[in-house]
Amino acid sequence: MTPKLKLNNNINWTKRTIDSLFDLKKGEMLEKELITPEGKYEYFNGGVKNSGRTDKFNTFKNTISVIVGGSCGYVRLADKNFFCGQSNCTLNLLDPLELDLKFAYYALKSQQERIEALAFGTTIQNIRISDLKELEIPFTSNKNEQHAIANTLSVFDERLENLASLIEINRKLRDEYAHKLFSLDEAFLSHWKLEALQSQMHEITLGEIFNFKSGKYLKSEERLEEGKFPYYGAGIDNTGFVAEPNTEKDTISIISNGYSLGNIRYHEIPWFNGTGSIALEPMNNEIYVPFFYCALKYLQKDIKERMKSDDSPFLSLKLAGEIKVPYVKSFQLQRKAGKIVFLLDQKLDQYKKELSSLTVIRDTLLKKLFPDMTERTKSIKDY
């Protein structure tokens, strides 16, 4: 449950320069030979994710840092000791009694877009430390209010971190199970009592078991922002909704062109098959669609690589129909085997949706708590 904020709206909020609250120090260069995959500490430089690992650190945990070269403006609060690279800048509190660390982090995070706007350069962007020092951020001297804001936002971040971990664990488990299932790993089949697959599984083309349908063009203005039936085109996620679907539920789609060419999707509700997508509808009721969805997801990387090697990458209905997938005639075996991987895939999708939804809520709340000073009194009453 999200804690209810009890903020004093009459507290005098002000703007303070970053330089008046923090001691800023630019990171150090790390020699390439000191970067090792087995290193004890993360090495953060110009990217949002770590740039590798190393066996030494130069910054203690619970330190705020801002990227000043590369992915400029990204604000991070480290929970472990790390090596701060030269494209990073650390911000240490000048007076911990005046400013709560997590409140300081969220105050900076709320201004991340403004920090990003300080960047200059065409190829590799940079932020001048002098410009960063002069940037003003929202500040209140009331420690109770600082703690209330920090604690509330921390609840969201802890859940987001937990979800990210669950997503990674479930993705690895799903991929491992799919590999063992479709490569007919003897120990795996024995554990799940699927030994019959050893003799019954063989390859078949998609065109022998599915009907194919090209996506239909639909103007963006004809799509709805909200609705019951999602519109899927050449993007992995839906890009709007429609009043009437053109494809049934329990179907598969393959993205046929664009950046996400070859990506596989499963549809558990009726949907609109748009431009850049190919719908796969089972020919009969003896096909357990999730089994073939899992098989295609297992083959997805190979499919994408084959398509990208073409001078003009495009997946036609003919080529889609020629894709070979593992097949077993028994519907019961399809169902029993497919469910093992499919349930993990559904759980993974559930975690991803929760992560996306919670991120939007957290970011909205962050902006509500740290808006422009002229707007704060009005908007904070919503919470």
Curated annotation (Swiss-Prot):
Protein name as it appears in the record: Putative type I specificity subunit S.MgeORF438P
Organism ancestry: Bacteria, Bacillati, Mycoplasmatota, Mycoplasmoidales, Mycoplasmoidaceae
Region annotation Conserved region 2: where it falls in the sequence: 331-370
Domain statement: Contains two target DNA recognition domains (TRD), each specifying recognition of one of the two defined components of the target sequence. The TDRs show high structural similarity and each forms a globular structure. The two TDRs are separated by 2 long, conserved antiparallel helices that form a coiled coil structure.
Keyword Coiled coil: yes
Coiled coil: 143-182, 331-370
Region (TRD1): 1-142
Cited function: The specificity (S) subunit of a type I restriction enzyme; this subunit dictates DNA sequence specificity. This bacterium does not encode the associated endonuclease or methylase subunits.
TRD2: region residues: 183-330
Keyword annotations of the record: Coiled coil, DNA-binding, Restriction system
Annotated knockout phenotype: Not essential, it can be deleted.
